[in-house]
Amino acid sequence: MAVLTHGSPTPSGAHFDGKGINFTLFSAHAEQVTLCLFDEQGQERQIAMPARTGDIWHGYLPGGKPGQRYGYRVSGPFEPSRGHRFNPHKLLIDPRTRALEGKVGDDPRFTGGVSQPDVRDSAAALPKCLVIHEEYDWQGDKPPAIPWGNTVIYEAHVRGLTQLHPDIPPELRGTYAALAHPALIEHLKTLGITTLELLPVQFHIDEPRLQKMGLSNYWGYNVLAPFAVDPDYASGREGISPLRELRDAVKALHNAGIEVILDVVFNHSAELDVFGPTLCQRGIDNASYYWLTPDGEYDNITGCGNALRLSHPYVTQWVIDCLNYWRDSCHVDGFRFDLGTVLGRTPAFDQHAPLFAALAADERLSACKLIAEPWDIGLGGYQLGNFPTGFSEWNDQYRDAMRGFWLRGEVPRGTFAQHFAASSSLFEQRGRLPSASINQITAHDGFTLLDLLCFNQKHNQMNGEENRDGSDNNHSNNFGCEGLVADAAIWQRRKACQRALLTTLLLSQGTPMLLAGDEQGHSQQGNNNAYCQNNILTWLDWGSADRALMTFTADLIRLRQQIPALTQDQWWQSGDSNVQWLDSQGQALSDAAWEQGCQQQLQILLSQRWLVLINATDHECEMHLPEGEWEGIPPFGVSDHAERLTTWRGSAHTICVLIKRD
C-alpha cells in the first residue's frame, strides 16, 4: 500500500531523486488534492496529498521510480460565477508533466459541467502523466550564438519539412530524427540558414470539432502539456524516447552551426471555452490560471476559448520554469511566443508586466532569442513595436507593405523604403535595434509565396468551414488567372515577382524569416489557413522542388552576409555610409522628391558598394546608375567577363543587385 510522506514544496512538478518521487501541485483555491497512481493495467490508487505549504500541495512517494503513471483529482467549490470549477470526478493532468502516455479523444467524459458539475469519471479516457528521469550526454554541445545581424530564420514544421524527403529513410521521415539527418542539414547549410524555428513541439491535442470532421490540429497550437515533448513527431525506435530524439536533433543542428528556436504556446490552453474538455488547469485552479470576466466567464482574447492569466505570480513562474526546462534539457536557443500580447496583459498590455520582468531578470532566458507575435484579438491587442527591449517581433506591417508594393502597386516607395530599413519608425524611437523587426513575406499562417502569386481568393474548403476561415486580406495578385494553371506570360510575371519578393526579404535591414518551402516553390493550392491539413497539401514535395529558385535563394543569403549595412545591426542614419536612396536617374532623393516621379522605381546603395535596383512597375524601364563602374553579381549576373554598366534596363516586376568595381 503506497503511503505519501510530506515531502517538499520544491522542486515543482514530479521529480525522482534516486530514492523516490516528490510530487507538487499548485492550487490556491482547492480544498483537497488527491494524487492518483496508475499501474500498467490502468488500476488507480488514490492518495490524499498530505501537506500544503502556501498554495503548493505536496507529498513524497518512497520507492517511486521513473515510469510511474499519475494524475490528480482536485476538490473544491463548483461556483462558476466566482470562477471555480472544481470537480473530483475528473482526472487532471499535471501542468508540469514532462511526458504523457496516451491521446485525448473526443470523449463526453471530459465535460466538466457548465452550470453543474458533470459526475462521469474521466480517468479511463485521459492520458496519464509519466515521471521521467533521463540522463543525456551532450558531448560538449555549445550554442551557435549567431549574432542577430547575421541571423536568417527558417520557419518549419517537423513533419511538413521532412515527411516527403527522398534521402531520409522512410521510418525517420516526419520525425525529430529527420531533423538530424545529414540530407536535411545539408539543405539548411547550402541555403545559408542560421536558425531553424520549429512550429510547436509541445504536447498538443486535436480539438473535438476537428476530430468529428476527421481532421487534426496539424500546426500544434492547441497545447495540453507545455513541458512535454510531443510524441507524434517521434520515430518510436526502441529505447529512444521523444525527448532523447529531440535532443539528438538539436545537438546535430548545433554541430552544423544552426540554432533552434521553438514556437511556444502560453496564451491559451487546450481546454478551450466553457464547453471544452476539463483536462488540467480548469479543474486545478480555474480562477488563478485564466483571465475571467466579473461573472466568471472566460475572457476570450485569444479566439481560442480562453486566455491564460500570465500576470498571476504562480502562472508567471510556471512559464519561466517551462522555458528554462526547454533551454536546459534540450539546449534550444530561443522561443517564438504565439499571440504574444497575452504575455504582457495585466489585463491591459504593459511593457513592465510580471512575465516581461521575470524574463529580463533571468540571465539564461534573457540571453536567448525571444520573438513575439505582437497581437491578440482582445482590446488593445495590436502591439507591434511596443514589446520591451530583448524581444524581436513579427512585423506584419513589413509583410503588407512589401506585398502591396510589388503585387498591388498600392504602396509608395517612401513607405517601401521605411520598411526596407527595418521599419525604423516602429522600433528606433523605442530604443530597439533593427533586428527587432522580424521581416517576413509569408509565414505558416497565410498563403505560401507561390500561392500569393497564383490566388486572389483563399481556397480553404478542405478545412470544413465552408471557406469562412482564413484571412480575406492577403494583398495577393494572380496576374489574371486564378490557380496554378496559367499561360507562359502570366508565369513569367509571377516568377519575376517571386524573385523580387525573396530578394526584398533577404536584403532588407532587420531579421529575415523565410517560410520553409518558399525557396522551393511550394503550393498549398490556395489554402491560406492549413492548420488542420496533415497531408500532402502542407508537406514539402522535394521531388518537384524548383532547384533554380533554391540556388537563387542561397545566393541571396550569401550576398546578404557580405553587406555590412545588413549585418551590423545598427540603424541607418542620413548621410552615413550604410545607405543612399536614389531615383531612377541615380540622383539622391530629396525629401520632396520622394513624393514625385514614379513611385514604383528606386535605387538603394548599400555600404557604398552594392546597388539594389527596383522596378515594381508593370513595364520595362531604364535607370541611370550613379557614378562608378558597376557589374552584375550572383544571383543577378556572372562576375566573369562582366560588362561594365552605366545604365540598367529592367523588366517589369524586377529587382537586381550590382556591385561597384574597385
Swiss-Prot record:
Pathway: Glycan degradation; glycogen degradation. The active site is at residues 338, 373. It catalyses: Hydrolysis of (1->6)-alpha-D-glucosidic linkages to branches with degrees of polymerization of three or four glucose residues in limit dextrin. It comes from the Bacteria. Its EC number is 3.2.1.196. Keywords: Carbohydrate metabolism, Glycogen metabolism, Glycosidase, Hydrolase. SMART domains: Aamy. The record marks 445 as: Transition state stabilizer. The keyword Kinase does not apply. It holds the Pfam family GlgX_C. GO terms for molecular function: glycogen debranching enzyme activity; hydrolase activity, hydrolyzing O-glycosyl compounds. One of its GO terms (biological process) is glycogen catabolic process. PANTHER family: GLYCOGEN DEBRANCHING ENZYME (PTHR43002). Removes maltotriose and maltotetraose chains that are attached by 1,6-alpha-linkage to the limit dextrin main chain, generating a debranched limit dextrin. NCBIfam families: glgX_debranch, PRK03705.1. HAMAP family: GlgX (MF_01248). Belongs to the glycosyl hydrolase 13 family. This is Glycogen debranching enzyme. The gene is glgX.
